[in-house]
Amino acid sequence: MYKVRISGIGCCLVDRIYDRVDFQSELFGKYLSKKAGDGGLEPGKLTFEEELEHFSGDGFLAKILPQLTEGRDPQIESIGVPCVVALINAAQLAWRESEVCFYGCRGDDGVGEDLLQKLQQTNLDLSHYRIQEGSETASTSVLSDPNFDNGHGERTFVNTIGASWHYLPEEVDASFYDSEICVFSGTALVPRIHQGLSTMLRKAKEHGSITIVNTVYDFLNQKKNPEQRWPMGDCD
């Protein structure tokens, strides 16, 4: 039986969810953003760990996170971000009719090994899931305040980009573009792929692929032009 090939590229990381973080507290206010893109925390938005450390002068894992969570462990650790989660769902729903492949990278650390073991329990083809030696696996600390905004609740995200800094378009081989469907998802958390998005989309179209782009909070472009919309690719 012929199977449709679906290939997705983007970020794959560990989400660590911390509940009951008080966004109205004096301590949270210490790390609150003063202006858009400055690296401080903003309810409902994402910042990078290194940007938050530069903004505050404090280490995230050593000081900021233990303070905000009162030393609690995460309530939930799970596979995160839109790309790999969407691909897992596609592989579950259409496993008879499709071959679903993930293109991405992880670090050579224990977190990456644990993530790989979880992914191996799915129907994904992981033969293009690379190891970036000497790098840590990407993760996001999700700070949740269920009482924020008059009980509507909100989350704040601190992303450790890790190995994803080093994943390049040149590392993506021809098999990706030989797919009936090419998915680009959450690429703002894989900066080099995001910067090369236009070229990769054109190449996929030249091969006759259906292309799908899913977005995620783009901190780098928010920092670069806080008053402008985020560009998608070099021809936007």
Summary of predicted features, one role per range:
Residues 9-11, 104-108, 131, 144-146, ...:
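Cofactor-binding loop segments of dinucleotide-utilizing enzymes, especially the Rossmann-like FAD-
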